Amino acid sequence: MNEFLINLEDKPGAMAECCEVIGEAGINILAGAGIASDSAAVVIVTDDADGTVEALKSIGVTYTMRPLETAVLHHSPGSLGVFTRSLAENGINLQSIFIMKTDGDEVHIGYSTA
């Protein structure tokens, strides 16, 4: 599984264009987050990395594709803190993290590291 860090213009419709072209290619977006300050960016996870590459190329946006690791944590207070602390103690720098789904007592996460 991969994540895509997409650099966008900070203007109305920039994210919509990316989501539309990915959807029109029949690709499902599984998770995502966006943020804007001086510039705008969105990070998404899809069910088809190759198709996502082609879709993003077709609209000329700048992106970076990174491998996404996954883990299943207990869905309780503090479990994410324990997980991220273990990464830090092993010298692993966290680049991104997603809540992929919750299922009863479990939370499935996706994350990338440097």
Q: What are these model-derived regions, one by one?
A:
Residues 1-114:
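A conserved regulatory-domain signal marking ACT and ACT-like small-molecule sensing domains
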